[in-house]
Protein backbone atom coordinates (compact mmCIF):
# COMPACT_ATOMS: atom_id res chain seq x y z
CA UNK A 1 0.00 0.00 0.00
CA UNK A 2 1.25 3.50 -0.79
CA UNK A 3 0.22 6.96 0.25
CA UNK A 4 0.11 9.56 -2.51
CA UNK A 5 0.20 13.31 -1.94
CA UNK A 6 -0.58 14.63 -5.46
CA UNK A 7 -3.68 12.67 -6.43
CA UNK A 8 -4.35 14.42 -9.76
CA UNK A 9 -1.86 16.00 -12.12
CA UNK A 10 -1.64 16.77 -15.82
CA UNK A 11 2.16 16.77 -15.58
CA UNK A 12 4.16 13.57 -15.04
CA UNK A 13 6.31 13.56 -11.94
CA UNK A 14 7.51 11.54 -8.99
CA UNK A 15 4.89 11.07 -6.28
CA UNK A 16 2.03 12.26 -8.50
CA UNK A 17 -0.82 10.46 -10.20
CA UNK A 18 -0.55 11.59 -13.80
CA UNK A 19 -3.83 11.69 -15.72
CA UNK A 20 -3.30 10.21 -19.18
CA UNK A 21 -4.57 12.26 -22.10
CA UNK A 22 -7.05 10.81 -24.57
CA UNK A 23 -4.24 10.50 -27.13
CA UNK A 24 -2.03 8.60 -24.67
CA UNK A 25 -4.88 6.26 -23.77
CA UNK A 26 -5.16 5.17 -27.39
CA UNK A 27 -1.61 3.82 -27.40
CA UNK A 28 -1.54 0.18 -26.25
CA UNK A 29 -0.18 -0.23 -22.71
CA UNK A 30 2.32 -0.43 -21.22
CA UNK A 31 4.28 2.21 -23.15
CA UNK A 32 4.52 4.75 -20.35
CA UNK A 33 7.30 5.01 -17.74
CA UNK A 34 6.27 2.16 -15.47
CA UNK A 35 7.48 4.03 -12.39
CA UNK A 36 4.93 6.78 -13.05
CA UNK A 37 1.62 6.42 -11.23
CA UNK A 38 -1.37 7.01 -13.50
CA UNK A 39 -5.10 7.65 -13.61
CA UNK A 40 -7.18 6.74 -16.63
CA UNK A 41 -10.58 7.92 -17.77
CA UNK A 42 -12.55 9.95 -20.27
CA UNK A 43 -12.99 13.60 -19.35
CA UNK A 44 -16.52 14.88 -20.11
CA UNK A 45 -15.01 17.31 -22.60
CA UNK A 46 -13.43 14.42 -24.54
CA UNK A 47 -16.61 12.44 -25.10
CA UNK A 48 -17.73 11.83 -28.68
CA UNK A 49 -20.06 9.31 -30.28
CA UNK A 50 -16.98 7.05 -30.37
CA UNK A 51 -16.48 7.21 -26.59
CA UNK A 52 -17.19 3.48 -26.12
CA UNK A 53 -14.20 2.61 -28.30
CA UNK A 54 -12.02 4.91 -26.23
CA UNK A 55 -13.40 3.35 -23.05
CA UNK A 56 -12.08 -0.03 -24.18
CA UNK A 57 -8.61 1.53 -23.95
CA UNK A 58 -9.45 2.84 -20.48
CA UNK A 59 -10.40 -0.68 -19.39
CA UNK A 60 -7.10 -2.13 -20.62
CA UNK A 61 -5.05 0.51 -18.83
CA UNK A 62 -7.12 0.21 -15.63
CA UNK A 63 -5.83 -3.32 -15.05
CA UNK A 64 -2.20 -2.19 -14.74
CA UNK A 65 -0.71 -1.90 -11.27
CA UNK A 66 0.75 1.55 -12.00
CA UNK A 67 -2.80 2.87 -12.56
CA UNK A 68 -3.91 4.05 -9.12
CA UNK A 69 -7.26 5.72 -9.90
CA UNK A 70 -10.07 5.88 -12.46
CA UNK A 71 -10.95 9.27 -13.93
CA UNK A 72 -11.26 11.99 -14.15
CA UNK A 73 -14.88 11.39 -15.05
CA UNK A 74 -18.16 13.02 -14.12
CA UNK A 75 -20.76 15.56 -15.17
CA UNK A 76 -20.24 19.05 -16.56
CA UNK A 77 -23.33 21.23 -17.10
CA UNK A 78 -21.39 23.86 -19.03
CA UNK A 79 -21.04 21.58 -22.02
CA UNK A 80 -23.88 19.83 -23.81
CA UNK A 81 -23.10 16.19 -24.45
CA UNK A 82 -25.59 13.32 -24.69
CA UNK A 83 -22.93 10.84 -23.55
CA UNK A 84 -21.98 12.16 -20.11
CA UNK A 85 -24.27 10.06 -17.93
CA UNK A 86 -23.67 6.76 -19.70
CA UNK A 87 -19.92 7.34 -19.73
CA UNK A 88 -19.88 8.33 -16.06
CA UNK A 89 -21.83 5.21 -15.08
CA UNK A 90 -19.30 3.11 -17.00
CA UNK A 91 -16.45 4.69 -15.00
CA UNK A 92 -18.28 4.09 -11.71
CA UNK A 93 -18.68 0.41 -12.55
CA UNK A 94 -15.05 0.12 -13.67
CA UNK A 95 -13.85 1.72 -10.43
CA UNK A 96 -15.71 -0.93 -8.45
CA UNK A 97 -14.61 -3.74 -10.76
CA UNK A 98 -10.87 -3.01 -10.48
CA UNK A 99 -11.02 -1.74 -6.89
CA UNK A 100 -9.55 1.72 -7.51
CA UNK A 101 -10.74 5.19 -6.38
CA UNK A 102 -12.80 7.35 -8.74
CA UNK A 103 -11.66 10.93 -9.44
CA UNK A 104 -14.72 13.11 -10.03
CA UNK A 105 -15.00 16.04 -12.44
CA UNK A 106 -18.07 18.08 -11.53
CA UNK A 107 -19.29 21.43 -12.82
CA UNK A 108 -22.68 22.66 -11.60
CA UNK A 109 -23.85 19.09 -10.94
CA UNK A 110 -23.13 18.43 -7.25
CA UNK A 111 -26.66 17.35 -6.34
CA UNK A 112 -26.79 14.98 -9.30
CA UNK A 113 -23.41 13.45 -8.45
CA UNK A 114 -24.63 12.85 -4.89
CA UNK A 115 -27.79 11.15 -6.20
CA UNK A 116 -25.69 8.87 -8.40
CA UNK A 117 -23.42 8.07 -5.45
CA UNK A 118 -26.45 7.04 -3.41
CA UNK A 119 -27.80 5.02 -6.35
CA UNK A 120 -24.62 2.96 -6.77
CA UNK A 121 -23.53 2.83 -3.12
CA UNK A 122 -19.88 2.37 -4.17
CA UNK A 123 -17.29 0.68 -1.98
CA UNK A 124 -14.45 2.60 -3.63
CA UNK A 125 -13.65 6.19 -2.59
CA UNK A 126 -14.97 9.03 -4.75
CA UNK A 127 -12.59 11.99 -4.80
CA UNK A 128 -14.11 15.37 -5.69
CA UNK A 129 -11.20 16.87 -7.60
CA UNK A 130 -10.37 20.58 -7.74
CA UNK A 131 -12.93 21.44 -5.08
CA UNK A 132 -13.60 25.19 -4.78
CA UNK A 133 -17.09 25.12 -3.28
CA UNK A 134 -18.34 26.86 -0.17
CA UNK A 135 -18.32 25.14 3.24
CA UNK A 136 -22.03 24.29 3.02
CA UNK A 137 -21.34 22.32 -0.14
CA UNK A 138 -18.24 20.75 1.41
CA UNK A 139 -20.27 19.59 4.40
CA UNK A 140 -22.90 18.13 2.08
CA UNK A 141 -20.30 16.07 0.23
CA UNK A 142 -18.41 15.03 3.35
CA UNK A 143 -21.64 13.81 4.91
CA UNK A 144 -22.08 11.48 1.93
CA UNK A 145 -18.56 10.09 2.30
CA UNK A 146 -16.75 11.95 -0.49
CA UNK A 147 -13.11 12.96 -0.30
CA UNK A 148 -12.30 16.57 -1.22
CA UNK A 149 -9.19 17.38 -3.24
CA UNK A 150 -7.84 20.93 -3.13
CA UNK A 151 -5.45 22.53 -5.58
CA UNK A 152 -4.17 26.01 -6.37
CA UNK A 153 -7.60 27.64 -5.95
CA UNK A 154 -9.79 26.85 -2.97
CA UNK A 155 -12.31 28.25 -0.50
CA UNK A 156 -10.54 29.01 2.78
CA UNK A 157 -13.47 27.98 4.97
CA UNK A 158 -13.93 24.69 3.13
CA UNK A 159 -10.27 23.83 3.63
CA UNK A 160 -10.60 24.56 7.34
CA UNK A 161 -13.64 22.36 7.94
CA UNK A 162 -12.49 19.37 5.89
CA UNK A 163 -11.28 16.51 8.12
CA UNK A 164 -7.64 15.65 7.47
CA UNK A 165 -8.50 12.07 6.59
CA UNK A 166 -10.88 13.29 3.85
CA UNK A 167 -8.56 15.98 2.47
CA UNK A 168 -6.51 15.36 -0.68
CA UNK A 169 -4.09 17.60 -2.56
CA UNK A 170 -3.49 18.00 -6.28
CA UNK A 171 -1.58 20.12 -8.77
CA UNK A 172 -3.99 19.55 -11.69
CA UNK A 173 -2.72 22.04 -14.31
CA UNK A 174 -1.17 24.47 -11.82
CA UNK A 175 2.30 25.95 -12.18
CA UNK A 176 2.69 25.52 -8.41
CA UNK A 177 4.38 22.40 -7.07
CA UNK A 178 2.48 20.03 -4.81
CA UNK A 179 4.73 21.13 -1.94
CA UNK A 180 3.76 24.76 -2.48
CA UNK A 181 0.08 23.83 -2.52
CA UNK A 182 0.55 21.69 0.58
CA UNK A 183 2.23 24.59 2.40
CA UNK A 184 -0.65 26.93 1.51
CA UNK A 185 -3.19 24.42 2.80
CA UNK A 186 -1.23 23.89 6.02
CA UNK A 187 -1.01 27.64 6.55
CA UNK A 188 -4.80 27.98 6.25
CA UNK A 189 -5.34 25.04 8.60
CA UNK A 190 -2.60 26.23 10.98
CA UNK A 191 -1.09 22.78 11.00
CA UNK A 192 2.40 21.60 10.17
CA UNK A 193 2.20 17.94 11.07
CA UNK A 194 -1.24 16.46 10.31
CA UNK A 195 -1.35 13.71 7.71
CA UNK A 196 -3.80 14.40 4.89
CA UNK A 197 -6.09 11.68 3.47
CA UNK A 198 -4.35 9.22 5.75
CA UNK A 199 -7.06 6.62 5.30
CA UNK A 200 -6.99 6.88 1.49
CA UNK A 201 -4.40 4.29 0.56
CA UNK A 202 -3.77 3.20 -3.00
CA UNK A 203 -3.06 -0.37 -4.04
PLM feature segments, named:
Residues 1-203:
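Mid-domain alpha/beta scaffold segments of enzyme catalytic cores
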Amino acid sequence: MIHILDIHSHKPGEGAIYNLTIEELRVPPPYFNQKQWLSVGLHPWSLTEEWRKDFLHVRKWALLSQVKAIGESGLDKIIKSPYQHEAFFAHVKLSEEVGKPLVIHCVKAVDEIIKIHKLFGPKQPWIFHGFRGKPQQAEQLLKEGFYLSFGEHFNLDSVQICPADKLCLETDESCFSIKEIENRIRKVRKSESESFSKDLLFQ
